[in-house]
Structure formats: C-alpha cells, structure tokens
C-alpha cells in the first residue's frame, strides 16, 4: 500500500493508494466513481425513508418536489465539488434523478411514460447535474478570489519547480 517517503515540500509522510478525507475517499488515480455511487445509494436510502410523506394525499405536488430537492439532493451532492464526472456517472446521476421523480409520482418503471412528460409535470427547474455544476463553479470562483493560496496556485498550474531532463 505505502511506497517511499515523500521528501518534497519538507513534509515527512508516505504515499498511499487511497485515504478518507472529510468523509470522501480519495484515490491515487483520482477516480471518484465509487464516491458517486456511494452518494447515490445514500440518496436512494433517504428517498425510500420519505415514502410515507411522498404517498400522502394531503401534501401537494410542489411541496413534495421541494422536499426532494431539500432533503434528498443535498445528500447526493455532498462533496460533489471535487468529483470528476464522466459520461457514465452523468448517466447514473440522470437516472437517479428520474428515479426520484418517478417514485414521487408513483409511476412504475414498467409504465410506458417518457422522461420528458415526467419532467414537464414536475417542472423541477434545474436538474441535479446542473446543481452539481453550479456548486463546482461557485467553489472555483471562491478559490480564484483567494489572494495567495496553495489551491489557487495548483488550479492555475503555477507550481514552480525544476523539471528533470528529458
């Protein structure tokens, strides 16, 4: 798991393949598909816990939509600022969002109802992927406004060091 000690930046440490940081699993290759799957499963669990509320006929549809946006989506989006979302993960996120809306409207997966008709009935405004992109851009803007920080230097690619020959 561990390799030779790190000697740059005067830090004594070792290189590991993966570690947990602020509740997120960070891997050496930067792959975060497992983290996205974990958050989607947590969101699915929250959605199933809301079943009794979502099946209630006393609560109107706009309130149910707002409940999903406020109670389910933040669980899924926790830490999404650091994710690298590929096409496969994008499809998973879109499928999860539509699963939430189908569950909200009590439409079975066997029903031949288009996704567009669901979205038209719900009218959610911004998609889950769009909300994630908004959070990423807000975080990027926050980093760029900082005066002198390691994160800003890293994002701009201005780490000065000697490059080996070759």
What would you call each of these model-derived segments?
Residues 1-166:
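Short linear motifs embedded in intrinsically disordered, charge-biased segments
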């Amino acid at each position: 798991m561990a390799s030779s000690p790190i000697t740059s930046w005067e830090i004594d440490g070792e290189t590991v393949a993966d570690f947990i940081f602020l509740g997120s699993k960070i891997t050496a290759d930067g792959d975060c598909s497992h983290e996205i799957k974990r958050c989607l499963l947590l969101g699915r669990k929250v959605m199933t816990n809301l079943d009794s509320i979502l099946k209630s006929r006393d609560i109107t549809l706009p309130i149910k939509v707002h409940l999903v946006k406020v109670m389910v989506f933040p669980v899924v989006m926790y830490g999404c600022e650091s994710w690298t979302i590929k096409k496969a993960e994008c499809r998973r996120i879109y499928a999860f969002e539509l699963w939430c809306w189908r569950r909200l409207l009590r439409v079975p997966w066997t029903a031949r109802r288009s996704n567009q008709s669901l979205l038209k009935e719900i009218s959610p405004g911004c998609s889950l992927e769009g909300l994630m992109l908004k959070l990423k851009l807000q975080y990027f803007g926050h980093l760029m406004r900082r005066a002198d920080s390691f994160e800003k230097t890293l994002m701009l690619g201005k780490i000065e060091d000697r490059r080996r020959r070759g």
